[in-house]
């Protein structure tokens, strides 16, 4: 394969998952969208695939991704899996509107899946129509770019394709497709499917496939299956620590939405907190608050326990219990490590006093409805002078508690060997100027429904460069408008 191609069909394709037994999936062709057109594509993702961003033909991208032309990827497939949804096992899951088109084999021999969301009905669609709407597609397309740019592990999206086709969701809505790119589409629920059917040979075959493709370094371990589970646990702990440190609420942490490689996967009613609220629920359908912001670490452990249950035919129970027992410490180390970075205090290590400083700050955030990300960005500019902390009053952080916290923070800074300039530089690289808030997405979606896609393209530029101030984007660094709090999100997509 050449180092830079100008067409998707010029890439080198494979589909290793399709070489597994046919009951692992269903072969199905995508259903073309009516009058498909390209809304936006992510040049960085294109280059990761080996495409030349400057030579890509928008009409060709729309044709291939909208179903008007066949990609030479082999036969596209819908994967079968199961999962626990809101704590209840559901055996009747699978790719109900998405198709795994195949794997791009890059010049450096990496494998990246291409998965088309909104591609039409499959055997696993149940009562769904197999489509995705423009609203949810814009959200996934933009947030995947935002998360990757923040350094939070996430799937990517090559392009967003719109259409003149409509379907019923919140009223009649236009259909769209997103071409998702990630090394892995294996969910916790893939393993649950075979376990609960008692198909232990297939369970072993799936685990062997995952170790060979995603964790080849574990093949020589004493128990490769336990080593794989430990790696999934480690990555999951790190991922959720990243979420909590940036105030990200996934919204639907079902086991079928959990990736075994620790990526944020299957975006739905997600939210970045405008004000810090541990009890915040981003999904209106989550009436019990199972997936509230503060619950996410515990739910991650619950989901890992469900995966452990599914792996019992391969791993001794006591080994799995010991592995799960280590999750809390792994998560805490990752979370406090990330928060220490955000405070510019990494050189001290997350010792007891620093952890207490972080805990107390989060308590103050919750008590004062503080905008966590705006606070941390402003704190990055602390230059040793009291005046550089005046932003606390502007952010309603002028309580006695904040004054006491400020004094303790300054003491930590003063005891460090790191210069203020170096600390500021480091903090500005982990505390974003811009975070992708729901109101920003809502504005772009409203315009897109009127046929104006420029706001989507502008937001993509902003969220791909979140740590640097950008001309014309000043308002996105300010407090969200009052109406932002009334935005209602559900699982509808």
Swiss-Prot record:
Its cofactor is Mg(2+); Mn(2+). The gene is ydiU. Its EC number is 2.7.7.-, 2.7.7.108. Transmembrane segments: none annotated. One of its GO terms (molecular function) is AMPylase activity. ATP binds at residues 94, 96-97, 117, 129-130, 180, 187, 266. It catalyses: L-seryl-[protein] + ATP = 3-O-(5'-adenylyl)-L-seryl-[protein] + diphosphate; L-threonyl-[protein] + ATP = 3-O-(5'-adenylyl)-L-threonyl-[protein] + diphosphate; L-tyrosyl-[protein] + ATP = O-(5'-adenylyl)-L-tyrosyl-[protein] + diphosphate; L-histidyl-[protein] + UTP = N(tele)-(5'-uridylyl)-L-histidyl-[protein] + diphosphate. Nucleotidyltransferase involved in the post-translational modification of proteins. It can catalyze the addition of adenosine monophosphate (AMP) or uridine monophosphate (UMP) to a protein, resulting in modifications known as AMPylation and UMPylation. Belongs to the SELO family. Mg(2+) binds at residues 257, 266. It is an enzyme of class 2 (transferase). Keywords: ATP-binding, Magnesium, Manganese, Metal-binding, Nucleotide-binding, Nucleotidyltransferase, Transferase. The active site is at residue 256. It comes from Hahella chejuensis (strain KCTC 2396). This is Protein nucleotidyltransferase YdiU. InterPro entries: SelO. NCBIfam families: PRK00029.1 (NF000658).
């Amino acid at each position: 394969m050449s180092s830079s191609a100008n067409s998707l069909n010029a890439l080198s394709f494979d589909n290793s998952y399709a070489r597994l037994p046919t009951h692992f999936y269903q072969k199905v062709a995508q259903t073309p969208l009516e009058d498909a057109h390209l809304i936006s594509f992510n040049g960085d993702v294109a280059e990761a695939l080996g495409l030349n961003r400057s030579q890509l033909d928008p009409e060709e991208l729309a044709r291939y991704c909208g179903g008007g032309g066949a990609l030479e990827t082999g036969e596209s497939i819908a994967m079968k899996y199961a999962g626990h949804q809101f704590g209840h096992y559901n055996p009747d899951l699978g790719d109900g509107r998405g198709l795994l088109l195949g794997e791009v084999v890059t010049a450096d021999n990496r494998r990246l899946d291409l998965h088309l969301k909104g591609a039409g009905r499959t055997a696993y669609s149940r009562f769904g129509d197999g489509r995705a709407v423009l609203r949810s597609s814009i959200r996934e397309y933009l947030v995947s770019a935002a998360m990757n740019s923040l350094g939070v592990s996430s799937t990517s999206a090559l392009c967003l394709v719109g259409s003149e086709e409509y379907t019923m969701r919140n009223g009649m809505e236009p259909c769209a497709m997103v071409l998702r790119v990630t090394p892995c589409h294996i969910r916790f629920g893939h393993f649950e499917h075979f376990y609960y059917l008692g198909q232990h040979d297939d369970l072993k075959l799936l685990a062997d496939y995952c170790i060979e493709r995603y964790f080849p370094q574990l093949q020589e371990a004493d128990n490769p299956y336990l080593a794989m589970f430990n790696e999934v646990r480690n990555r999951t702990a790190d991922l959720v620590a990243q979420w909590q440190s940036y105030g990200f609420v996934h919204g639907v942490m079902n086991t079928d939405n959990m990736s075994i490689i620790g990526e944020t996967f299957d975006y739905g009613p997600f939210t970045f907190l405008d004000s810090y609220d541990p009890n915040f629920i981003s999904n209106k359908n989550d009436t019990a608050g199972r997936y509230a912001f503060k619950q996410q670490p515990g739910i991650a452990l619950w989901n890992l326990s469900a995966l452990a249950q599914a792996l019992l035919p391969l791993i001794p129970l006591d080994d799995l219990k010991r592995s799960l027992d280590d999750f809390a410490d792994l998560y805490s180390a990752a979370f406090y490590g990330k928060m220490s970075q955000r405070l510019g205090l990494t050189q001290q290590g997350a010792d007891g006093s620093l952890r207490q400083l972080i805990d107390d700050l989060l308590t103050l955030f919750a008590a004062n409805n503080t905008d966590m990300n705006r606070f941390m960005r402003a704190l990055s500019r602390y230059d040793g002078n009291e005046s550089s902390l005046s932003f606390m009053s502007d952010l309603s952080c002028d309580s006695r508690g904040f004054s006491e916290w400020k004094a303790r923070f300054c003491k930590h800074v003063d005891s460090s060997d790191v210069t203020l300039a170096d600390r500021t530089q480091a903090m500005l690289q982990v505390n974003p100027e811009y975070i992708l808030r729901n109101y920003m997405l809502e504005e772009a979606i409203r315009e897109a429904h009127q046929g104006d896609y420029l706001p989507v393209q502008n937001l993509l530029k902003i969220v791909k460069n979140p740590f640097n101030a950008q001309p014309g984007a000043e308002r996105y660094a300010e407090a969200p408008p009052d109406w932002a709090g009334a935005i209602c999100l559900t699982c509808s997509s």
